[in-house]
A protein has these predicted regions:
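C-terminal intrinsically disordered extensions
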Residues: 1, 154, 165-167
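Sec-dependent N-terminal signal peptides
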Residues: 3-14
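Transmembrane beta-barrel domains of Gram-negative outer membranes and organellar outer membranes
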Residues: 17-153, 160-164, 182-235
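Glycine- and Gly-Pro-enriched alpha-helical subdomains that act as flexible
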Residues: 170-171
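Mobile, glycine-rich extracellular loop/lid and propeptide segments
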Residues: 179
């Protein structure tokens, strides 16, 4: 696990989204980087901006095509802010998600998706040919939400496999999980763990947060309806 904690901020604007009863922010389609089973509703869209360590920035736009299917694109630079020669990522990246099973009182919602957007530098032209933090690729995610005295509590988990960032020889399936909880109508806390099994020599048998992966946390502030600011701490 990287010892350096990176401070990131994410601004998300969601238009046309219908919120569940009693919930003052939309169920997150992602926690910080981890995908959940939630999708944008038909006709709604979200615009996100991620500021990365080293002056990088990623802009993303997602739209709800149906109540179950969302489509998005993202693009950016690992050093947009700063004095170094500007470098862009090699291509726009895709983000697709389809909700297979609706969440019920007794069972979680389940979604499948594709996310090809990684983070950090893109190591092009060397033996890696990948982002510093690999994209999730194809994934299956599950989410379950409960109403608490504070607000909504959501638990999320999933498995993923990437098909392009494999030049480093690590093609292991990956595991991820996380949670989000409302503290009040304005503030929410998000936590996640991406085991990054396709980036290290850890396996499911030796899985441990202390051995590797990315442990992230964020504080989400709903400034006004449909406008959310996140202060994120990433390993």
């Amino acid at each position: 696990m990287k010892p350096l904690i990176l401070l990131l901020s994410i601004c998300s604007i969601t238009y046309g989204q219908t919120y569940p009863t009693g919930q003052n922010y939309p169920p997150p389609t992602d926690l910080i980087t981890v995908p959940t089973a939630a999708t944008l509703m038909r006709g709604s869209f979200s615009l996100g901006m991620r500021i990365q360590d080293g002056g990088g920035m990623i802009l993303g736009l997602r739209a709800g095509i149906t109540d179950r299917f969302q489509f998005g694109l993202s693009y950016g630079s690992p050093n947009l802010i700063g004095d170094d020669s500007l470098r862009w990522y090699p291509r726009p990246e895709a983000n697709l998600k389809y909700m297979l099973i609706d969440e019920s009182i007794t069972s979680p919602g389940v979604a499948i998706g594709l996310n090809t957007q990684g983070f950090g530098n893109f190591n092009q032209g060397d033996s890696l040919n990948r982002y510093d933090m690999k994209a999730y690729g194809f994934y299956l995610s599950a989410s379950k939400n409960w109403k608490t005295s504070l607000g909504n509590l959501g638990l999320h988990s999933g498995v993923s496999s990437h098909f392009t960032e494999t030049d480093d020889g690590d093609e292991d399936p990956n595991l991820f999980f996380g949670m989000d909880i409302e503290l009040n109508p304005e503030f929410s806390v998000l936590m996640e763990y991406n085991a990054a099994l396709n980036e290290n020599n850890m396996t499911t048998e030796t899985l441990a947060i202390s051995r590797g992966g990315y442990l992230n946390a964020a504080l989400r502030w709903t400034i006004v309806e449909h406008l959310h600011l996140e202060l994120t701490f990433n390993h």
